[in-house]
Amino acid sequence: MSGNGVFRDPPGGRKAVAVWSIGVAVYFVAVIFRTSLGVAGLEAADRFHVNASALSTFSILQLLVYAGMQVPVGLMVDRLGTKKVLTLGAVLFTAGQIGFALSPSYGMALAARALLGCGDAMTFISVLRLGTRWFPARRGPLMAQLAGLVGMAGNLVSTLVLAPVLHGVGWVQAFAGSAVAGVVVLVPLVLFLKDHPEGHEPPVRAGGGGFVRRQIRDSWQEPGTRLGLWVHFTTQFPAMVFLLLWGMPFLVEDQGLARTTAAGLLTLVVASNMGFGLLYGQLIGRRQSARIPLALGTVGLTALLWAATLAHPGPHAPMWLLVTLCVVLGTCGPASMIGFDFARPANPPDRQGTASGITNMGGFLASMTTLLAIGLLLDATGDDYRIAFSSVFAVELLGLTQILRLRPRALARERTRLAAVRPPSTPSAPSAPSASAAAAASAAPADPADSPRPAPA
């Protein structure tokens, strides 16, 4: 922070990459643990002798804890800093994974997944905060997409590594062995991670109940924060539901695929996510006007492919259609990151954690709702996956309505803020103000590279 109270852009560089890499390594392990049930759903049903509704409760409880923790975690990150929150998160999700491995009963396994969800909830917002503290603001969209890409790599490990290990050595050895990764990432986290570069310390706000209420109120009042939440809500959940629990049973039990083939399709979703993550990050980093078209295009294409798959005549959809569906589901994760690209410019640096927490609730609330709906509908219809997965369309319609309602207000406010911080046009001032300075005044575009152009209409 400069002497006049304006935030300077962090320098980036090799040290920033090293510190950020420690944070995303923690997130990588958290995603492995989060998605491990997705490749063990059928085994979990056998181990704990539960039906589809009870099985979905594992993921629903985990997501309920995760979503409920987002605002408290955002406040903790704003108040305590990234290192303390990430360390606590790593301890909790490692303990949860060990507990899940050793649980002899359904109730104890539920408690372990709740503990895992609590620790998992502390990782992603912390990594986003690291990105904004260590890298220039123009890198914000790309760093967020890269963090999401690393998370999807964790999902890939669950599919390609944990699944065969589970089938080879058994439940306890597979889950307890994977928990070692949580211990491994704790070491560099405790020894080397720094919250911010020297000379870029955030302001210290007074704590207490007033701080909490003010942070939540001010973040929520911003249309950009609410638009970010609904973009995240609408775009993330189709892939999350598919990967977290119901994709494998759908492909094996409803579509008649072998487990190895189904695992390959789950891997395709992850690989597609990683590829589209880089593409979306580059597009949004260069032109913010791409945010809404990318988000709405992803929602529309996802709905179209699900409709084609579920409505296909005959007992099974053709393989080419399932492959296309999985490729399109891979765009959901990158599209959900667009939500943060609306919340980020709407809030100053000392409110980024809270605003990110509110935004991050969206997709997990939608996922939790859809996971429960699918489980209940499967039990009610005698495992009719076509009816059960139709619940996806109702949730997408709700989110789409809110995006269209909030879009004009959020973009109008963004234009107003951009105009307020744009310096007079003179030959000696060719560049736009830094996004960090604008954010300190609660008035910055997400990507200053777009500042000389009119904001999107």
Predicted regions and their residues:
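Helix-to-loop junctions at the C-terminal end of transmembrane segments
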Residues: 69-81, 276-290
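Cytoplasmic membrane-interface "Motif A"-like loop-to-helix N-cap segments
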Residues: 79-89, 285-300
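Helix-loop-helix hairpin linking two adjacent transmembrane segments in secondary transporters
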Residues: 146-197
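Conserved MFS/SLC helix-loop-helix module at the cytosolic interface between two early adjacent transmembrane helices
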Residues: 68-107
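Extracytoplasmic gate region of multi-pass secondary transporters
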Residues: 37-38, 223-278, 370-371, 375
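Helix-breaking motifs and short loop linkers at transmembrane-helix boundaries and internal kinks
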Residues: 49, 81, 102-108, 136, ...
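Cytoplasmic helix-loop-helix junction between adjacent transmembrane helices
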Residues: 112-151
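Juxtamembrane intracellular "pre-TM" segments in multi-pass secondary transporters
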Residues: 2-13, 196-229, 420-426
